[in-house]
Amino acid sequence: MSRVLARLCAVAIAACLLFTTWSAATPKQAAALDPTVGYLMAHFTGESSTDQQIYLAHSTDGLRWTDLNNGGLVLRSPIGTRGVRDPALVRSPGGDRYWIVATDLCIACGQDWSNAINNGSRSLVVWESTDLVNWSAPWLLNVAGAIPDGRNAWAPEAIWNPDTGDYVLYWATNVPLNGAAKHRIYYARTTDFRGITTPQIYVSRPGNQEIIDTQIVEVPSGVGAYRYVRASRDAQITLEGSNSLLGTWTNLGNLSGIGLTGAQVEGPMWMKVNARNEWVLYLDQYASGRGYLPVLTTNPSSPSAYRLPASGSYAMGGTKKRHGSILNLTAAEQNRVLARWPAAAVNRIQSYNFQDRYVRHYDYDVRIDPNVSPAQDGQWRVVPGLVGSGTVSIQSVNYPGHYLRHYGYDFRLEANDGTATFAADATFRQVAGLANSSWTSFQSYSHPDRYLRHYAYLLRLDPVSDAQSRADATFRVTS
């Protein structure tokens, strides 16, 4: 008996040690990740069937973004409604697994908003990866089917909960409850995004007030009074704080003090700035159709600490950025992502009849100069056009998201504001050179009888009618 007891004790001790090792290592693995150096944004771009897919963008500073895959979609959903919106990027605590979890919704794919609200997909679309570049086939995760009369599942988010050792997955579902049919935030727990616990109400506003978009950020000790801050779009952009993901949340106020309410913006998206205690809360300017706007803060729990960025201090890239999420990247992750989806080549644009001069921007004006300094002011990426097929746009290297754009037939370097007018004015057809067919000319998309040309060294959009103007409108795209 004593020998049996000894063996049982040994087994019990080993099991305890194994459990202790596992339970201690799992939450702490997040702290063992290498330092983060860059940022990856997953998003959708608009309302067409192609726009409602997964797009990626990269940034080194969190404010100036470059579209990956030359602005093309990266993942397409072939399941459910065959479209996705509101993607959430999720990393495992150990950094060895990633998920994209998105709304299964495609307006313009045969479903209108009324059906999407009242009889939409009850599932989310999920992809899984071990390296951020090779993704599994997607699957549907039914999250609202277990909610009595749950009518859809929108805007998913997920965050690791160290208190329970799994993820809190939360989303919005339209449910008639207590006399009010409206969207509320539900949550469930999951370890693998294939199965979930029974959904519970997470956030519900009083009366008929809906809430659809909410995202949580974890804040380090010493910054504000709360470990977690939640930004939600209801009638306002409301901030709430808690020291436990599944505990009580305290209303901290909203962003109306800087002129932002739920009538103008939605889709709050947090980003922690690498290596310092600063945060960016991106908000989707849905009412004006301008895409994401960054709002800056050094204390997420204090509404008075938020400020709008200076003009020209951010650039969102060539595609419109709609509701998504941002993942801070380690150097290894960043290298993999950029190797898989490299940015377009960096080029200079040389004048045909002044071959010592190159197109450059200077104080947002555009001209041809010799000996361009700093060199990056004369470096460009010729990328797929912002509008039309078989077209190009010319994007600045040191001001990502800024393009050569004509206005009043004069050229300036301007940030893409997401409008159709900007897209047309910043798009060209790259044709054989008008003065030499081995060179290149840029025909305006919005004014096809006019070409990009220099006049007195300044770039203009003019008709071309003689040998001089043909030479002025001829360039070489070179390294």
What residue ranges belong to the model's regions?
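Short coil/turn motifs at helix boundaries and re-entrant loops, enriched in small/polar
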Residues: 59-62, 129-132, 190, 297-300, ...
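Short polar catalytic/cofactor-binding loops
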Residues: 43-50, 61, 353-357, 364, ...
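Acidic glycine-/aspartate-rich tracts in secreted/extracellular proteins
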Residues: 246, 299-302, 364-365, 409-410, ...
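Short, exposed beta-strand-loop hairpins at the edges of beta-sheets
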Residues: 317-318, 461-467
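Carbohydrate-active catalytic/glycan-binding domains of CAZyme proteins
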Residues: 31-346, 427, 437
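C-terminal region of N-terminal signal peptides and the immediate post-cleavage residues
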Residues: 17-33
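Extracellular glycan-recognition/adhesion modules and their associated mucin-like linkers
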Residues: 225, 231, 334-365, 382-410, ...
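N-terminal export and membrane-targeting signals
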Residues: 1-12, 25, 29
